Amino acid sequence: MAESKLVIGDRSFASRLIMGTGGATNLAVLEQALIASGTELTTVAIRRVDADGGTGLLDLLNRLGITPLPNTAGSRSAAEAVLTAQLAREALNTNWVKLEVIADERTLWPDAVELVRAAEQLVDDGFVVLPYTTDDPVLARRLEDTGCAAVMPLGSPIGTGLGIANPHNIEMIVAGARVPVVLDAGIGTASDAALAMELGCDAVLLASAVTRAADPPAMAAAMAAAVTAGYLARCAGRIPKRFWAQASSPAR
């Protein structure tokens, strides 16, 4: 079965694995991991990037042919997130943005009220908005209604590696979405990424699971394989769960 492409807004991607860059020990290891992942879209925190720098992260992404996706990491209000997105548009010449508005540093949980406010303003300003949100199906629908090009619910808090805490919530978001659903945050290992795709997500975004692994390039390759396997399994259709056993070969 041929694997279809991930389509977000007016762009398509062969890979359904979106990478982040936070937590990488150095650019050399990050480069190996990005290559192993096969990703075509990678987030960069605009606050940590010198757009005029010489041999930095942006140069690496450009050399690898990977599209940078600026994010508003660190923003605590809609106003702050909007300003960061506007600066990213000027610096990187892109109207794509991963929107993050965080409530506090301890949980790194999205602030729903400020997130929706920022999304509304950025969509009105012509941005292609990919919001990092909670696993609340109502909030996901609200963000979609504002005109966001995708919704990106968390599996569990950023950097925890706890996997998908509420699989049913993710399924509800998928069932009601008319835009791509990208599982964002909480991935710890390859089975988490496969589960996200089996639940119906269109893509997975992860960073720490690779950058903080003992062997980042090897884990990146594992994540790429897991995302593909989970997607193909979802498309193929799993067998129904049964209470009693059923012989695979008939007795007669």
Curated annotation (Swiss-Prot):
Give the InterPro entries listed for this entry.
Aldolase_TIM (IPR013785), Thiazole_synthase_ThiG (IPR033983), ThiG (IPR008867)
Q: In which pathway does it act?
A: Cofactor biosynthesis; thiamine diphosphate biosynthesis
Q: Does the keyword Cytoplasm apply?
A: yes
Membrane-crossing residue ranges in chain numbering: none
Q: Which domain of life is it from?
A: Bacteria
Q: List UniProt keywords, sorted A-Z.
A: Cytoplasm, Schiff base, Thiamine biosynthesis, Transferase
* Task performed by this protein: Catalyzes the rearrangement of 1-deoxy-D-xylulose 5-phosphate (DXP) to produce the thiazole phosphate moiety of thiamine. Sulfur is provided by the thiocarboxylate moiety of the carrier protein ThiS. In vitro, sulfur can be provided by H(2)S.
| Family stated for the protein in its record | Belongs to the ThiG family.
Q: What is this protein called?
A: Thiazole synthase
Organism taxonomic ancestry: Bacteria, Bacillati, Actinomycetota, Actinomycetes, Mycobacteriales
Q: Which gene encodes it?
A: thiG
